[in-house]
Each structure stands twice: as C-alpha cells, then as structure tokens.
C-alpha cells in the first residue's frame, strides 16, 4: 500500500473538492494515459488494485507510471464506540482527485492493449475516467 513515510499533522480536515485539477492534467511520461473526469477520493488499496489489473493484462510489455499518491489521512472510530471523545485515529490514506488529473500513464504497448488495460483499471476506481493519448494533443 502507498502511504507517506511521515507527515507534519497526523489528522486532516475533510476539505472540499472544487474546480478542475490545476497540476498533473497532461501526459508527462508515457504515450497513453487514464484521466479523471469526476472528483473523488481514491484509496491506496484502489490505486494498487488498478495497478495490478493493468500489469497482469500487459504482462511483460510496456511501462506504467502511477501519477497519484495517497497523502490525505482518513480517520475512523472503533466499532461500538459512543460519539464524542475526540476525532478517531488514522485508518487509511486517500488521494484527492479532481477532474482532469492524469491517474496512470503507459508506454511501450499498442493503443488497443493500452485501452483495454486502462478499461480494466477504471473498473477498480471510484471516479469516472477517460483514455487519452499524445497523438490527440494531450502532452505537457
């Protein structure tokens, strides 16, 4: 699972997801990419599940870049605990995703293989996505 080695503050506020992604909205490494079309929180387990789905499909061909990192802690209180008594302890890590953010990139495979690999990965993610490529003008 992906998570920060250390953080300045153990607990964060929920925050709000407004607007489109300002950074990381264009292809930087690979030929093809998976871009978010909705906002949401992507869990570290979901990031890993999508990565495994892609790597199993492309087998030994190509290279994959993960462009998102879970740096926001989610807290939870134990089961059957009364309300109050402060905020719960950190439970899992999420990445805040806004529309336009490139989630994964890939190169070294054909477009058909990349499309299918990203389709399999998209089923593991809680946000809507679309396939983008450099030849369509999605480069930095």
Curated annotation (Swiss-Prot):
<keyword id="KW-0820">tRNA-binding</keyword>
<dbReference type="InterPro" id="IPR016180">
    <property type="entry name" value="Ribosomal_uL16_dom"/>
</dbReference>
<dbReference type="InterPro" id="IPR020798">
    <property type="entry name" value="Ribosomal_uL16_CS"/>
</dbReference>
<dbReference type="GO" id="GO:0000049">
    <property type="term" value="F:tRNA binding"/>
</dbReference>
<dbReference type="GO" id="GO:0022625">
    <property type="term" value="C:cytosolic large ribosomal subunit"/>
</dbReference>
<keyword id="KW-0689">Ribosomal protein</keyword>
<comment type="subunit">
    <text>Part of the 50S ribosomal subunit.</text>
</comment>
<keyword id="KW-0687">Ribonucleoprotein</keyword>
<dbReference type="InterPro" id="IPR036920">
    <property type="entry name" value="Ribosomal_uL16_sf"/>
</dbReference>
<protein>
    <recommendedName>
        <fullName>Large ribosomal subunit protein uL16</fullName>
    </recommendedName>
</protein>
<comment type="function">
    <text>Binds 23S rRNA and is also seen to make contacts with the A and possibly P site tRNAs.</text>
</comment>
<dbReference type="InterPro" id="IPR000114">
    <property type="entry name" value="Ribosomal_uL16_bact-type"/>
</dbReference>
<feature type="region of interest" description="Disordered">
    <location>
        <begin position="1"/>
        <end position="20"/>
    </location>
</feature>
<dbReference type="GO" id="GO:0003735">
    <property type="term" value="F:structural constituent of ribosome"/>
</dbReference>
<dbReference type="InterPro" id="IPR047873">
    <property type="entry name" value="Ribosomal_uL16"/>
</dbReference>
<comment type="similarity">
    <text>Belongs to the universal ribosomal protein uL16 family.</text>
</comment>
<keyword id="KW-0694">RNA-binding</keyword>
<dbReference type="GO" id="GO:0019843">
    <property type="term" value="F:rRNA binding"/>
</dbReference>
<feature type="compositionally biased region" description="Basic residues">
    <location>
        <begin position="1"/>
        <end position="16"/>
    </location>
</feature>
<keyword id="KW-0699">rRNA-binding</keyword>
<dbReference type="GO" id="GO:0006412">
    <property type="term" value="P:translation"/>
</dbReference>
<dbReference type="Pfam" id="PF00252">
    <property type="entry name" value="Ribosomal_L16"/>
</dbReference>
